[in-house]
């Protein structure tokens, strides 16, 4: 069973031996590659790269990311999450695996993105909300 983040933090704080702690919790660390996770999600969601490209609003660039020809930026991954109809939690994990900051509800722009994800809005509807608030859009 996976250990929650707070339990890992508490364990690290109280650990006498970091090596023993790391060995004990090996299965709790994020080790999956971004591409592997994206492919896993595509399979789970039963979507194609073409559908993701269309629904994310970033078009052909998606193919370069899925073929490891380009590194995705944070906003690009968020756009892809809309294109794959990911949940908020799946999007957060996607950002963690890619080593990006997760969406933060205390940030106005991120708050709008979180709202859009939680309410099943499209990326275009999300961008309208961002634009109406004079914030940088995703696409």
Descriptions of predicted regions:
Residues 56-72, 97-99:
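Recognition helix of helix-turn-helix/homeodomain-like DNA-binding domains
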Residues 42, 53, 81:
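The alpha-helix within a helix-turn-helix
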Residues 14-48, 126-138:
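A short, Lys/Arg-rich alpha-helix, primarily the initiator
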Residues 86-100:
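Short C-terminal boundary/hinge segments that cap the last helix of small helical domains
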């Amino acid at each position: 069973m996976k250990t929650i983040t707070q339990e890992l933090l508490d364990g690290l704080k109280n650990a006498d031996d970091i090596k023993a702690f790391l060995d004990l919790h090996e299965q709790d660390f994020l080790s999956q590659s971004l591409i592997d996770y994206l492919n896993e999600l595509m399979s789970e969601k039963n979507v194609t790269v073409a559908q993701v490209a269309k629904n994310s609003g970033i078009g052909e660039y998606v193919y370069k990311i899925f073929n490891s020809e380009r590194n995705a930026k944070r906003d690009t991954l968020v756009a892809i999450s809309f294109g794959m109809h990911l949940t908020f939690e799946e999007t957060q994990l996607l950002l963690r695996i890619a080593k990006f900051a997760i969406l933060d509800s205390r940030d106005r722009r991120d708050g709008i993105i979180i709202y859009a994800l939680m309410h099943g809005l499209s990326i275009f509807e999300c961008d309208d909300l961002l634009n109406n608030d004079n914030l940088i859009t995703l696409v």
